[in-house]
Structure formats: C-alpha cells, structure tokens
C-alpha cells in the first residue's frame, strides 16, 4: 500500500454538521481511512470542510492547490460504503 503522506495523497471535502450529529457511525467509517490535517467550520452552509491525507485522494504536487472532493456514501444493513469524487475546477 502506498504511503499517503510520502506520496501527498491530499484532499478537501465537506460534511454537513447534521450528518455528524445524527449519523456519527457513518462519519466514523469515513474518517477511519484518512488523517485529518485541518477542519474548518462554515456557519453559512452548516458544514465542516476537512483537509486530509489518505489513499482515497489523488497525489498532489508540492505547491499545488489541494483539490476539493465530493463525498458520496450509502448505508445498507449496518455497512457503510463511500467514495470521494474529485470536483472539477473547485479548489
């Protein structure tokens, strides 16, 4: 497995505060495979924007803008499946 820190697999994504409060188990499953570097509260959208390292993100060159990802998840019979999709032109 690639080392996400050495290979700079970095991304940003948002999670609604409502999801954190109502479905913490889903958020725990998402956070299990990443290392959060920063979290920023956005009161206007009631979301938290995370900057994180993990193999779920593409490699980013030094001095490049960290890309934004859209998080999609599905819960079925207690199992949580999720994916990160890189947003085009959003940084």
Protein language model regions, located:
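Detector for the mature cores of small, proteolytically processed
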Residues: 1-30, 37-91
């Amino acid at each position: 497995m690639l080392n996400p820190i050495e290979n700079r697999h970095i991304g940003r994504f948002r999670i609604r505060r409502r999801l954190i409060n109502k479905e913490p188990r889903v958020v725990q499953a998402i956070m299990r495979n990443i290392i959060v570097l920063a979290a920023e509260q956005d009161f206007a959208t009631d979301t938290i924007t995370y900057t994180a390292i993990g193999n779920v993100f593409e490699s980013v060159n030094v001095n490049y803008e960290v890309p934004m990802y859209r998080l999609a998840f599905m819960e079925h019979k207690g199992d949580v499946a999720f994916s990160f999709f890189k947003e085009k032109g959003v940084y």
